[in-house]
Structures are given as structure tokens and as C-alpha cells.
Amino acid sequence: PIRSSAASDVYKRQIKNRGSLFSLSGEDQNITKGRLVIEELFSFADQSKDISPKEIHFFISKALNQPNESRNFKLESKSAFSLTTPKLEVIPRNQSQEDFINSISSHDISFGIGPAGTGKTYLAVAVAVNLFIQRKINKIILTRPLVEAGERLGFLPGDLAQKVDPYLQPLYDALNEMLGFETVNKFIERGNIELAPLAYMRGRTLNDAFLILDEAQNCTSMQMKMFLTRLGFNSKAVVTGDVTQIDLPSKKMSGLADAVKILEGQKGISFFHFASKDVVRHNLVQSIIEAYEKNSKNNED
């Protein structure tokens, strides 16, 4: 027998298989969810798609978020739509991700707020790349506030690329997955893709562009205003961040938290809030986030 450690550990059951036949033992509600996970994985494989640990964890997480009393639920393994990029097809992994993409599509300025692992920035990059390859925009601009350097890059050793790259690496990673390393570098050289610290956005008006501000909780209110007012004709801006992970000095107001108070409800601007249940990374990531949230609430009480 082969023990499926990922599913077995999560559901506290034994899973055995012989070829394509599986047997499950444990509590009834866990067996029901485990059966549906296995069925969805078979369905996923039937679509000629490779099953990686990422897919397994996704389906397990999806099942765990279903009510225990639900006996005949259906996991939503396939979204109604996907985002095509040159290297891969980006499919929303839960309803929140699909709603966030719809929010970006229907608003010129969109905020995605929530914990790490919910796919906020990755989805924003996917939408940007999708629009770029359709030639609906001419430029993708990705930026982050450089809190550790205080945005004073002159105090860091090396040229601009050497100084900035470590801070922007997560954005590079997403672009490389969707476009490929050589293509990303080609478009950077041509000026079609730009990755820069937030301070370098000052004084510009950006037309026919898709702007993404990542880690926005670490920009100041003035920086947030500066970024949002860079928006030109036929442009979109997406702001992502987590208001529980602010690294600014205690006396400085987070530009993201301030924007929620000032702009939420403003026509043409959307605010989408992710929850810990929307995390699509390793199951432990969701558990860790929830544990810290619980501890934070206890400290407040």
C-alpha cells in the first residue's frame, strides 16, 4: 500500500491505493472530503494537466474550507475563465481570486488587500501580461517601496540594478514564469517592462500602461497619493498589500491603510479584501497566518 502523506496528515486518515483504486479509513466527514479530493485530482489529470504538490495542496485546502455537514459538495476545480500568458495559463484557484481578477478588469484602480499567499500580486502580474500580449497596453510598470533602504538608494553600494534587484525579485519571478527569462530581459531593454523603486515614479504621467504597486502597506500616504496620480489615459493601476505587515516607523501612517479610509467607496476604484482561507500556498501557511491573527486579537483584548 502507498500512503498519501499530504492528504493523510491533513485529514487524519489512512489512504491506500492499488493502481487507480483507493481506499480511505477514518471519520465519515473526512472520508467524504478525501474522496472528493481524489476525484478532483483524477478530473484534473484527465484534462492532460500535470499534478504537482501545489495542485494537491490546493484541492485539500478547498475541501477543508467546506462545512463538515456538507455531504455532497462539488469542488470548483476549474474557473470559468483563465489568463493566457506565453509560458503558462493562469487559472484562478478559488472564488476570491476570480473575483479579484474581475475587479481589476472592471476598474481603472484596484486594491487587493490580504495576507501573503493569496495570489494578489501574482494575479495582477498575470492580468498585466495578458493585456500586454494582446497589445491593449504598451508598458508594464512594477514597483515597491524600499523600506529597508528608506528609498535612499545612494546609501547602498553598487549600481541601480544591483541595488534594486533584491527588493524586486518576487516581481521578476512572476514575470519570468509567464514570459520567460530572455523575453523579460528583452522587454526591459526596450522599455516595455519597468521594475523600479516607488520613488522613481515621481513626476511622471503614464499612458497606455499597467501599473502595479506591491507591498503597498510600506509606502507613506504621500507616496500612495503620488503613485495613484501617475495614472494616464488607457492605463490601469493595481495596489497590493497586507495592512497587518507594516514595516514603517511607528510614527508614519501606512499609505495603504490611509487609502482604505480615504478612497473606499470612490467611483472607479475597487477594494478587494482576501482572508486567510484564501491562501493557496502550503497548508501550513494558512495555519500560521490564522495563529498569528488569533494571537494579535488576544493581545488587543
Regions found by a protein language model. Give the residues of each.
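Single conserved hydrophobic/aromatic residue that forms the stacking wall/gate
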Residues: P1-A7, Y11
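Long, highly charged amphipathic alpha-helices
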Residues: S5, K33-L36, E40, P170, ...
